[in-house]
C-alpha cells in the first residue's frame, strides 16, 4: 500500500514509472516505510491482493475524519447532520476493461458517493459498473435519524424516500416534472428572498401514493444567477423555505469533491486492468484524500488540500516533523548572509 500511496502523491503514470522513481530513491525508502519492489511485484499485488483491505482501511479513516469535523460549521445554519449524494462516472476502454460494462462500445465505472457536508468527508462510497443507475446504490446507504439527505432527481424513488421518512430522517431534492401531485395547503412566502411558493402536496397516482402515502412539501424558488425556477421536494416541514433552498445549493460541494479527486489524484487512468486493480487504486486515492483532510483539521491548517498534497510531494523523502512540512519556518537571512551568498548573474563568468 505504501508504494501505491507514493504513486498517488507523485501522480506516477505507470508501474514502470513507480519502479523507476522508487529505484532513484532506493537509499531513502526505509525512512518512509517502503521496500524496494520490482514492477512485477507491484503488478502482482494489484491483481491478487483483495481491494477490500484498502476499502476497510479507508472506511476506518472516514469515521475518524468525520469525528474530527463533527463540530465544523455548515454554510447553512442547521443543527442536523447534512449529507450530499451523487454518482460520478469514470470512462474506461471496453477492450481493456471488459468487465466494466456501460454502453455497447464503451466501458465505465461509477463512484456512488455520499459526503458529510461538515468537512466534505466521504461517509459512503461504493464502486459499480457504469451501467448501474444512481438510485440502485441508494438502499446500501445507512440512514441516520434526523439526518438531512440532499439528492438530485436521479435518486427519486418513493420506496427509498419512504425509508428515509420512516427512519425519522429528511430528504431534499428537485421535483421531477413527470411526478403527478395534488396541492393540499399553500403557505405564504417572502418573495424578496426569491421564493415563489411553499405548498403541502400529496402524490396523485395510486402507484406512487401506495409507496409514499404521507404529505410532502413543495417549494418553488427563483434562482436569479441562472434565471430559472427551481422546484424542491422535501419531507421537512420545520425548516424555513429559504433554508431548504440553501441546503440544495450546498449539494454543489459533492461536485467539487469529484472535481478535486479527478484533478489531484490518480483515478482516471489505472495501473492494472482487472476489477481488483481498479478498485484498489480508487480506494487508495480515497485514503490519501482522507489523510490530507485529517491532517488539515488536526493541525488547523489554512492551506487547501491541493497545497497540502504538493507539500507532501516535495518533502516526501525529507526527514522532518510532519507539522514542519505544512508550516515551514522561513530562514531569516541577515545582511551579512546576503553579501556572502550574493546571487551571481547568469552570464557573469
Residue spans for each PLM region:
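Single, function-defining residue in the core of a domain
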Residues: 1-17, 21, 49, 53-60, ...
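Short active-site-adjacent helix-start/loop capping segments
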Residues: 11-14, 26-31, 44, 92-93
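Major-groove recognition helix of helix-turn-helix-like DNA-binding domains
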Residues: 32-49, 59
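A short glycine/small-residue-enriched secondary-structure motif
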Residues: 17-27, 32-40
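A glycine- and small-aliphatic-rich helix-loop capping segment at beta-alpha/alpha-beta transitions
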Residues: 100
Amino acid at each position: 500500500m505504501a508504494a501505491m500511496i507514493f504513486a498517488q502523491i507523485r501522480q506516477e503514470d505507470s508501474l514502470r514509472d513507480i519502479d523507476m522513481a522508487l529505484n532513484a530513491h532506493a537509499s531513502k525508502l526505509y525512512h518512509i516505510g517502503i521496500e524496494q519492489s520490482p514492477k512485477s511485484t507491484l503488478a502482482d499485488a494489484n491483481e491478487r491482493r483483495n481491494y477490500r483491505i484498502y476499502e476497510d482501511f479507508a472506511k476506518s479513516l472516514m469515521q475518524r475524519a468525520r469525528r474530527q469535523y463533527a463540530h465544523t460549521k455548515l454554510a447553512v445554519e442547521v443543527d442536523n447532520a447534512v449529507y450530499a449524494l451523487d454518482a460520478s462516472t469514470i470512462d474506461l476502454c471496453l477492450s481493456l476493461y471488459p468487465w466494466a460494462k456501460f454502453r455497447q462500445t464503451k466501458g465505465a465505472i461509477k463512484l456512488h458517493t455520499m459526503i458529510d457536508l461538515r468537512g466534505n468527508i466521504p461517509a459512503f462510497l461504493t464502486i459499480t459498473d457504469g451501467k448501474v443507475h444512481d438510485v440502485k446504490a441508494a438502499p446500501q446507504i445507512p440512514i441516520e435519524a434526523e439526518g438531512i439527505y440532499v439528492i438530485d432527481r436521479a435518486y427519486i424513488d418513493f420506496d427509498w424516500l419512504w425509508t428515509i421518512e420512516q427512519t425519522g430522517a429528511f430528504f431534499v431534492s428537485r421535483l421531477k416534472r413527470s411526478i403527478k401531485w395534488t396541492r393540499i395547503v399553500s403557505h405564504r412566502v417572502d418573495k424578496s428572498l426569491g421564493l415563489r411558493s411553499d405548498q403541502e402536496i400529496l402524490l396523485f397516482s395510486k402507484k406512487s401514493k401506495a409507496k409514499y402515502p404521507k404529505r410532502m412539501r413543495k417549494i418553488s424558488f427563483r434562482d436569479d444567477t441562472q434565471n430559472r425556477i427551481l422546484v424542491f421536494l422535501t419531507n421537512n416541514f420545520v425548516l424555513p423555505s429559504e433554508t431548504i433552498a440553501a441546503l440544495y445549493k450546498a449539494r454543489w460541494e459533492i461536485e467539487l469533491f469529484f472535481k478535486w479527486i479527478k484533478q489531484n489524484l490518480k483515478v482516471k487512468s489505472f495501473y492494472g486492468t482487472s476489477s481488483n486493480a481498479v478498485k484498489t487504486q480508487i480506494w487508495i486515492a480515497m485514503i490519501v484524500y482522507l489523510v490530507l483532510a485529517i491532517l488539515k483539521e488536526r493541525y488547523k491548517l489554512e492551506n487547501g488540500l491541493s497545497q497540502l498534497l504538493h507539500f507532501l510531494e516535495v518533502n516526501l523523502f525529507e526527514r522532518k516533523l510532519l507539522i514542519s512540512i505544512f508550516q515551514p519556518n522561513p530562514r531569516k537571512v541577515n545582511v551579512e548572509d546576503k553579501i556572502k551568498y550574493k546571487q551571481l548573474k547568469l552570464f557573469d563568468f
